[in-house]
Amino acid sequence: MAKIVTLDLQNPDVLPVWQRLLQTLGLQNFTPAEVAHLDFTLGLYEDQQLVATASAAGNVIQYVGVDNEDQVSGSRFNTIISAVTNRLFQKQIFHIFVFTKPQYSRSFQHVGFHELTRSPQAAFLETGTPDVHDYLAQIPDFPAEVGATIAGIVMNANPFTWGHRYLIEQALQASDAVYVFVVNTDASLFTTAERQQLVEAGTADLKKVIVVNGGDYMVSYATFPAYFLPSTEATIQYQTTLDAQIFRDIIAPACHIKVRFVGTEPLSKTTGIYNQVLAEILPPQVALKVIDRKKDDQNHYVTATQVRQQIAAGQLDDLASLVPPSTYQFIQRHAQELHQRIQKGQQIHGN
C-alpha cells in the first residue's frame, strides 16, 4: 500500500535511505548547506520501500526522484508532485518553480507546469499564479517612439553606489530609456525592499529611468539548486545561461529592450562568469554593452562590497565618496540595525 510520509533528513536512519534512492537516479551532491536549505521533504513508500521523493525550499521544488524500474513510475511521479504542491498550498504558496534535468521537463508539464526555458543541463518551469505573464503585465511601459533604443540593467545594488549610478548614466547617454531591474532575493545585507528604495532614490532625478523589481525571473544564485551539477563554477554558468535566456526571450521582448548594460568585473569571479555567459547568450536579439567600472579619487574601483566592509568596521565617514546622498543618509539612520545583521551572520563579501 502506498503512503506519503514526511522525511526527517536529520534522522541518521532516514538520510542514507533518501540519499541512496537519489544516487541511483544520478543525483550525487548532498552538501549540508543544500540539505539544510530545504523546508521539508516528502517520501512515497510502497511495501516499506522508498520509491519516490521530493523536497521544497521556499517556492522551489527540489530533489525529485522516482524509482522507474517498473511501469508505475508515471503514477508515482504524479503522486509525489501532487503531495509536495499540496503541502505548499497549505503554506499559502501558490506560485511554484522547479529546476530539473531537461529529460524530466515533460513529466512536469504533464502535471501543469509550464517550461520557461531550458539549457542542455537544466530546465526551469513554473506553475500557479502570479505567473510570468502577470509579472510582465505589471511592468510600466515606456511611451517609446518607433526606433527608440530601450536599455536594460540588472543589479543587486547591495547597496546602491556611485558605481551603480555611473552605469545607469552611461546607459542613458546611449539609449532613449533604461529599465533597472533589482534582483529580488533577501539574501543580502540590505533587504530587497531597501535595495529597491535606494535605487529609486538614487535615480529620482534621472528622467526615462524605470526601476523594476526583478521578481522571480531574474534567477537568483540563492534559489538555484546545485545538487545535480558537478561544481560551483558549473552551477554559476548553468544558472546564468537560464537567466540570460529568460531575459533574452521573455523580459526583453515584452519591454522592447534592445541592449543590456553591465559593468566590467575585475574583482568578482562570479560576476565575471555571468558577464561572459551574457555575451554568449544575449546577442543578436539583445546587444551587450560592457562599461568600465567607475573609480574613486584614489583610482580604486567603487564597489558595494567595500561599502559593506566599511559598515561592518563602523567606518561611515568615508562612505560619502562611494554612495549617493540618499544611500549615505539611509546607512547613517540604520547603521545599528545593519551592524546587528552582520553580527548575526549576514555575509558582507561577494556581490
Protein language model regions, located:
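Short amphipathic alpha-helix that is part of the acyltransferase structural core
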Residues: 1-32
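Catalytic cores of nucleotide-enabled group-transfer and carboxylate-activating enzymes in metabolic
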Residues: 10-12, 44, 71, 77, ...
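Conserved beta-hairpin
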Residues: 38-52
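Short coil/loop residues immediately preceding or within conserved phosphate-binding loops
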Residues: 39, 61, 148
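Beta-strand-enriched, solvent-exposed domains that form extended recognition/catalytic surfaces
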Residues: 55-56, 86-91
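Conserved acetyl-CoA binding element of GNAT-fold acetyltransferases
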Residues: 57-72, 153
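Conserved acetyl-CoA-binding loop-helix of GNAT-fold acetyltransferases
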Residues: 72-88, 110, 164-169
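Nucleotidyltransferase catalytic core that binds NTPs
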Residues: 91, 99-351
